Amino acid sequence: MTNLQDQTQQIVPFIRSLLMPTTGPASIPDDTLEKHTLRSETSTYNLTVGDTGSGLIVFFPGFPGSIVGAHYTLQSNGNYKFDQMLLTAQNLPASYNYCRLVSRSLTVRSSTLPGGVYALNGTINAVTFQGSLSELTDVSYNGLMSATANINDKIGNVLVGEGVTVLSLPTSYDLGYVRLGDPIPAIGLDPKMVATCDSSDRPRVYTITAADDYQFSSQYQPGGVTITLFSANIDAITSLSVGGELVFQTSVHGLVLGATIYLIGFDGTTVITRAVAANNGLTTGTDNLMPFNLVISTNEITQPITSIKLEIVTSKSGGQAGDQMSWSAKGSLAVTIHGGNYPGALRPVTLVAYERVATGSVVTVAGVSNFELIPNPELAKNLVTEYGRFDPGAMNYTKLILSERDRLGIKTVWPTREYTDFREYFMEVADLNSPLKIAGAFGFKDIIRAIRRIAVPVVSTLFPPAAPLAHAIGEGVDYLLGDEAQAASGTARAASGKARAASGRIRQLTLAADKGYEVVANLFQVPQNPVVDGILASPGVLRGAHNLDCVLREGATLFPVVITTVEDAMTPKALNSKMFAVIEGVREDLQPPSQRGSFIRTLSGHRVYGYAPDGVLPLETGRDYTVVPIDDVWDDSIMLSKDPIPPIVGNSGNLAIAYMDVFRPKVPIHVAMTGALNACGEIEKVSFRSTKLATAHRLGLKLAGPGAFDVNTGPNWATFIKRFPHNPRDWDRLPYLNLPYLPPNAGRQYHLAMAASEFKETPELESAVRAMEAAANVDPLFQSALSVFMWLEENGIVTDMANFALSDPNAHRMRNFLANAPQAGSKSQRAKYGTAGYGVEARGPTPEEAQREKDTRISKKMETMGIYFATPEWVALNGHRGPSPGQLKYWQNTREIPDPNEDYLDYVHAEKSRLASEEQILRAATSIYGAPGQAEPPQAFIDEVAKVYEINHGRGPNQEQMKDLLLTAMEMKHRNPRRALPKPKPKPNAPTQRPPGRLGRWIRTVSDEDLE
């Protein structure tokens, strides 16, 4: 991932390398952490076209090694003939021991002409087959297209001059490293002897019943009678072994058998011949055993193997013409392909067939393969290796993207020109902060955005080390807001006065302040500013935005912010408001992209992130803080907002910051605070009191500050501390709806009036409101107008309707719309709403429809959380509610769909149990018992480790259990008779004596005999 300070790009290197291998290798961000080096290997071949002008190139796009593919030319008899293998430029086993394939792409095209040919002819068909090479039934030029029904895995009739590109996409994840078949030190009498270490991971085994009491009978012939006992399809491009036995019985004396195994290539020719038995005489009346034990190394396999054949030659010692020969046989063989079942080794295969290319032309195969490689001991002395970085967010994002590759237009075979054009689209997919312009043009934007919302926040919540990935969620909205889009909670700011605001691209401006008239005055003083000439966004844009994430058990204080959208130099178009939370520390990963990178310093030099850099915040703080917009607050958590809120300007959040700095609460304080705290310890009043009050009430919070608030704390900081309420919230949402002393509908109207605008700010406005109410009582038409206004405000479309009115000054479009609207009793009205009147549409959906919509909403929310069994039908059967904790636990433990209306109380408090595999237990026991190369752990120690896993329900040992296991291992090692004897320790006080005769190289000591 990129640096946290980079706010424009957040690249996932792994998916970028997968989709564009030419950009270079990248470490796979899974949890297979071994020191490795990244290497990009090229493959370039110029293949000569045969006499028929047709040929076939077989690619193994996922093979983890040097083998890339093979080339075959079509003969005049209709059969293919093997030409050559396609490999990487460097022979990897010569320098490296282990390998993992990261990405691979190959391009096939022709741009050369033989003598006498003046135009490029020929076309190419390409297909990716999700099976092995031997499983293809029709490999002709046209028959290849029937190998798959997936349109993203085949292309046809591409001009040979344009070419095709083969892209390797992974079929599995979290794979281990593969041994490359590298040579190992060995000495033999034969100077040509070679010893290699081949991969034994995930072998592919073919079991062949060669004979089941097969009866053979024939007459003697000179040279013997040859039969094919069996022929079976296999696939192999790496080392293999054949094992098994056949049992022969005969009643004829003097029979002699010979057996030969043939490994046959894709073109039908014999690649390897091995004699299993020669002149093997059969004894009558008994079982004659013929064992098979063959090992074929990778070096002997010069082309892809697709079948195996066993021939039996029967002869008779001293036989004469007409002599009868007969025997019966039974037995089975097993063909083991080393590493054959490793994902990508033998399947899928991509076949590229060309036809009608001029004879003698050159077809160029060029590509790149990116690897993670572990060098051999000699190379490791001079090559630096590094661990891969575990990044669950990047890995999860890659998996989700590739799981939707058919919907996102990601193919395995491409026309080269189309693949080149898609590179910009692939860069958008790899960049989590990209605006997805090209993806939007193709209709993929919504899918990718949904994947981003699912992949990154979930991972950052489950894996705290991956929290920086939440920083990348969604798209940057700065290009929409402009450089000067800022929100304010205090004093006015005329941001358009800056020179950079005069950019021709920025033609909208969003301002937010507590003193709207001052903002207008400042804007009026900049008459030549071209910025303020339109409305950036209506409140509906913010209302329709999606939530980002939840922050659990985080201390926070809350304060409301008022946002003013200005249409022109004198008209405040709309008011909006948002609740913010103050969180300790630098937590830009929790902010929307529009706020990141912006901060203001306090008087003590610390930073408050989320504020516009406008001077200095008049506070003394002891640490850094971050302010983030929120959508909701619960008992111990807050719901973050993804709304494109610009940085804050002003001082009315100072009270919340000061409280956070002094008391440092451990959970969110359920009271909103407002007020500008000055250097003298006094709390100053702020404007837009009722709008902020309504903002707090919508979340069920009280508003605390100086003045006529829910909690009037007075203008002094000490008084504020004494009168400040405790943390618990003491009322529900929309508190005005249930007041007993109001008429039934008055509470709703009062709440809407409080949330709508600043009706109660001045006596003039209050008198105007009373005048309107009096006019409505005497004028039914005016009463209807007020009802329409309340309907627009309740549904949040006041600004939209105002914009529509500006575009339709004479109301022609509105009259046409109303004239063409379905009337009560009309055919279209009856088809949509039945025989009821026109008012049915205004009343909304029926209870049954609303219930179904609720079930669908619950199901979609569960789907975003990865709970896919909660379909709308299941939710309806479950009492129109989501899964209970017991149902979720039951599904997590058993992966079975829980029964609706069954609570599964036994699972609520039951600890999640899982079983550890024998391989996992053995690996843990080996790691604890000793380092690699030491003695293997005894079975008793393995049993002790297995007991720990059983106690921990499938999890590994904790610290105390690890100490006990280490002590047990030490005791067992001391009791082990095979352990090496300890070195004798010198006595601590005994002086060391110089051995006799070692005074020097040329000085001989004088003995007593010399003195005599």
From Swiss-Prot:
Chain spans, region Disordered: 969-1012
Transmembrane segments: none
Keywords: Capsid protein, Host cytoplasm, Hydrolase, Metal-binding, Protease, Serine protease, T=13 icosahedral capsid protein, Virion
Molecular function terms, GO-annotated: metal ion binding; serine-type peptidase activity; structural molecule activity
Gene3D superfamilies hit by this protein: 2.60.120.20, 6.10.250.1030, Birnavirus VP3 protein, domain 2, Capsid protein VP3, domain 1, icosahedral virus
Entry EC no(s): 3.4.21.-
Tree of life domain: Viruses
Active site: 652, 692
Segments of skewed composition (Basic residues): 975-986
Region (Interaction with VP1 protein): 1003-1012
Post-translation changes: Specific enzymatic cleavages yield mature proteins. The capsid assembly seems to be regulated by polyprotein processing. The protease VP4 cleaves itself off the polyprotein, thus releasing pre-VP2 and VP3 within the infected cell. During capsid assembly, the C-terminus of pre-VP2 is further processed by VP4, giving rise to VP2, the external capsid protein and three small peptides that all stay closely associated with the capsid.
SS bonds (residue pairs): none
Pfam families found in the cross-reference section: Birna_VP2 (PF01766), Birna_VP3 (PF01767), Birna_VP4 (PF01768)
A GO BP annotation: proteolysis
Class of enzymatic activity (EC top level): hydrolase
Keyword rRNA-binding: no
Annotated binding of a divalent metal cation, by residue: 30
Marked site: Cleavage: 441-442, 487-488, 494-495, 501-502, 512-513, 755-756
Signal peptide annotation: none
Effect of residue 512 to D/L/N/V: Lethal for the virus
Coiled coil: none
Protein name in UniProt: Structural polyprotein
Species in which this protein is naturally found: Avian infectious bursal disease virus (strain Cu-1) (IBDV)
